[in-house]
A protein has these predicted regions:
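Loop-helix junctions at membrane interfaces
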Residues: 1-288
Length: 288
């Protein structure tokens, strides 16, 4: 798609404003619905609602998704804690804004499902790493000066930040790669005038070979299994036990194995049964 076509298909400001508000509200509701499911690290939450700003990034571009995600996460965190939560605007807000701006930027000029996979991996890595590092260092250590976190060495803080990033990544990736495409294609079929032309006309079967999509699950799954084995049979497990008290070491080990198995199985299922996940009738509706 050339630049001229892109300009012609720009959404009006009024629609982008409405999209931003919708993204923020839906993301806040979705994030709050799982706000009380914690990570095995003791901080952070289970958040499959990231499919919402990912969807808005594809349909409406970087800014509605970024602003909507930032506002939505602040609302959800503040409602959970009962006040304007400093940990959210110090960590979650900048992480969500940067992450979903990157998502929208990557897929904006030319959408393909390959770029969608790239955007998903970049966003979930960068955004979660920003949130994890800022939440631990800026909020827990510098802002609150909580003894349990102040006592951690810098290598333990980095380890915890990376570990929290991994947790978020492996629990968000399946939802983004499976549910978001379904939402995109459903909206493209129901409201084609709102969806950019390149998004509307591309189909999963044409743009995303099943082996590519499967590898997007299989590779992280294999990595998680290998990390789990390293946790069990190498000094990594001893390091976790010496820096983080029970039951965190056991939960972390279980996290690596469970997420590895789930991602690996999903990758196999997608490869062997893709037509049952993305039905061809949706493709036909979009092409019409």
């Amino acid at each position: 798609m050339n630049d001229t076509t892109s300009v012609k298909e720009q959404h009006p400001i009024s629609l982008l404003t409405v999209a931003t508000i919708m993204c923020a509200v839906l993301y806040a509701i979705g994030a709050y619905s799982t706000a009380y499911i914690p990570s095995p690290w003791g901080v952070g939450q289970f958040r499959p609602a990231v499919v919402i700003p990912a969807f808005f990034a594809v349909i409406f571009g970087p800014m509605p998704a970024a602003v909507g995600a930032a506002i939505g996460t602040l609302i959800a965190d503040s409602v959970k804690h009962g006040y304007l939560y400093p940990g959210s605007f110090l960590a979650a807000v900048p992480g969500n804004f940067i992450g979903f701006f990157l998502f929208g930027y990557i897929v904006k000029k030319k959408f393909t499902w390959g770029r969608f996979i790239l955007a998903s991996n970049v966003t979930l890595t960068v955004a979660n790493l920003i949130v994890a590092f800022l939440y631990i260092t800026v909020f827990k250590v510098l802002y609150l000066s909580q003894p349990a976190y102040v006592a951690l060495s810098w290598d333990a803080i980095v380890f915890l930040s990376v570990g929290l990033t991994i947790w978020w990544f492996v629990t968000m990736l399946p939802f983004v790669l499976i549910i978001t495409p379904l939402l995109i294609r459903a909206v493209a079929a129901a409201f084609p005038s709102v969806v950019p032309k390149d998004v509307r006309t591309h189909s999963l079967k044409e743009e995303l070979p099943k082996i590519t999509f499967s590898l997007a699950m299989l590779v992280p799954g294999l990595i998680m299994l290998l990390i789990g084995l390293a946790t069990t049979f190498t000094v990594v497990g001893n390091y976790i036990s010496s820096n983080f008290g029970p039951p965190i070491p056991t939960l972390i080990e279980l996290m690596f194995y469970a997420s590895g198995v789930v991602l690996f199985v999903l990758g196999i299922l997608i490869y062997t049964g893709q037509k049952f996940i993305w039905h061809s009738s949706l493709k036909e509706k979009i092409e019409k």
